[in-house]
Amino acid sequence: MPGSTTITEQAVPTFHHGRHEHGQNFLTDPAVIATFVELVTATRGPIIEIGPGDGALTVPLARLGRPVTAIEIDARLVQRLRCRLPSHVEVVSGDFLTHRLPSHPHVVVGNLPFHQTTAILRPLLHSFAWSDAVLLTQWEVARRRAG
């Protein structure tokens, strides 16, 4: 079974809005980004990032030196990310909902698009290969899933 569930309540005051049809809200708060990366640092293994957007999390995660696969649905962002990131970061152009997760242990991370949170969590919660997940979601979704 995947790692234990921990919910941290923290206000996220600053977002930069992306494309509405993709539910994009880009995280820009440096304190939240630092806390997020700190949580990921406590994990082991390759990292799968859902919806890297403009790379606010991807860039500092790449500095950890671990393999990172960032799955981005917005083709206009994929090319920009590929130009900005080192070679150990693979940027995949596609929808996470149709992406095949690896069968080996990995860490799932992401600032989930609000309108897709439940659709993303369903397959994750039924996958047994991931060891840890660090996900930023709406408070209501986190409470409902954690019981």
Describe the predicted segments one by one:
Residues M1-G147:
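Catalytic cores of RNA-modifying enzymes
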